[in-house]
C-alpha cells in the first residue's frame, strides 16, 4: 500500500512539474526526467538526453505533502 501511495504522489508531482516546464520549454521530448523523493521533498530534474548538446532543463523541488513547487531553476 505504501508503494502505491508513493507512486500516486510521484505521478502527481510529475504532472505539476510537467505543467510548469511545458510553459517555459514547450517541447520536453529532448529531456530525460529523473524523479527522486528526498528529505526536503520530491526532486524532479530534466536532463538533456544527448550529452553533446549544451544547456539543460528545469529542476524542481516539490513539497511531498502539498505537491506545491518549493523551488525551481531553469537552465537554457
Language-model features, listed with the residues they occupy:
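Short, non-transmembrane alpha-helical segments in secretory-pathway proteins
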Residues: 1-32
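Exposed beta-strand-loop-beta-strand "reactive/processing" segments of non-cytosolic proteins
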Residues: 29-69, 73-75
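Short, solvent-exposed mixed-charge patches
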Residues: 1, 75-76
Amino acid at each position: 500500500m505504501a508503494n502505491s501511495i508513493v507512486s500516486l504522489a510521484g505521478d502527481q508531482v510529475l504532472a505539476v512539474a510537467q505543467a510548469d516546464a511545458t510553459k517555459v520549454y514547450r517541447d520536453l521530448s529532448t529531456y530525460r526526467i529523473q524523479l527522486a523523493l528526498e528529505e526536503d521533498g520530491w526532486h524532479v530534474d530534466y536532463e538533456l538526453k544527448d550529452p553533446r548538446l549544451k544547456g539543460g532543463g528545469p529542476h524542481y523541488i516539490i513539497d511531498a505533502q502539498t505537491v506545491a513547487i518549493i523551488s525551481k531553476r531553469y537552465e537554457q
